[in-house]
Amino acid sequence: MKIRIAEYCGFCYGVKRAVDMAYKLAEANEASGTLGPLIHNPQLIEDLNTKGVPCRESLDEFQAGETVVFRSHGVGPDVYEAAHAKNLTILDATCPNVKAAQKKGQALAEAGYLPVIIGEKNHPEVKSIVQWAGKHAIVIERIKDIGNV
């Protein structure tokens, strides 16, 4: 059997950036962890864990002075506030494209618009965009749901 590898394969630039940031942190040997899985890749998450950057599910699992890595999917503004209040160092690995969507959603909401986000409402990336856009943002998961807006 012949196996061909696509010319362009591997992580997208946002994920590559997040992964590189996490491995540099591992090399620095600082007390740290990611808040939730950095990316959707269990093997990489386990490798980071063995290198001293474990996946943690809550800010409650961090001690003051530790570094928290925000996942590539982003987090809401309340998480930034809670991390600052806990005196954590933030390493923001949010994908630049996600960060741009968060800012756009926030700007639209602040300008009085109703942000409509198309995606899976329970996906971490969509959740983070909704949190920046405010509680009145709408998520559409299926085309048939558009008529309900």
Describe the function of each predicted region.
Residues M1-V149:
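The feature marks the mature, well-folded catalytic cores of soluble enzymes
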